[in-house]
Amino acid sequence: MLVSATEMLKKAKAGHYAVGQFNINNLEWTKSILLTAQELNSPVILGVSEGAGKYMTGFGTVAAMVKAMDKELGITVPVALHLDHGTYEGCYKCIKAGFTSIMFDGSHYPFEENLAKSTELVNVAHNLGLSIECEVGSIGGEEDGVVGMGECADPDECKTIADLGVDMLAAGIGNIHGKYPANWQGLSFETLDAIQAKTGVMPLVLHGGTGIPADMIKKAISLGVSKINVNTECQLSFADATRKYIEAGKDLEGKGFDPRKLLAPGADAIKATVKEKMELFGSVGKAE
């Protein structure tokens, strides 16, 4: 069932585990993630970037597909449909389309402007029963054209945004979107600890979950991270499985060219990746 992310993240924070946000790009992605969450009895957040939303012909199409698929597959675990790294305008489009959760990424604005826009969107979202995530300190790498260098957020600025009543807070702690470079310095647990001390029970969000070592993930969860975003890793798994299918010539065997057969190995690879992450994050069996 589609719900806001508020309750699942409160439970994750209290239970010292994290809920995975897995970004969707099409029907196969969505189906694979939903089925895995149901199989493992885990809450899940479906992330949609503005670029992916545009690719799928608009947020209205995405919301309709997810709601219908959730119903037709008989999904009973909590599912939040969440805008990832939303612009100010994108947030309003997703609210209108029927998303249950939004993220406003105002990290590229001067702090006061980020604060003003975040305040407005928190009030709008909560009046509609939606959850909202805001960001302080840009996350490294590139996300739909927004480039961040992996900076660390100011804990005092994090507290100011948290005090607005956001449901989850994304704070830069040296994390990066996409593949991590060989010279990456790792997560700044000192920064995370300081942010946790300032924000208390606020669920914290770790973006760029792909490629972070398992021990760092577990330590981040112990320091208050309750939501971890995964996108690139599913894309790499999908691409690798699809490549092997083609290179083995299976598309030339019988009706192996049928998209339902051609895309099946990739879909299975996404399921395996999502399962691995849910087990690592500790969310298996936590759906209520």
Please provide the spans of the model-predicted regions:
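A general structural-boundary detector
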Residues: 20, 145-148, 182, 207, ...
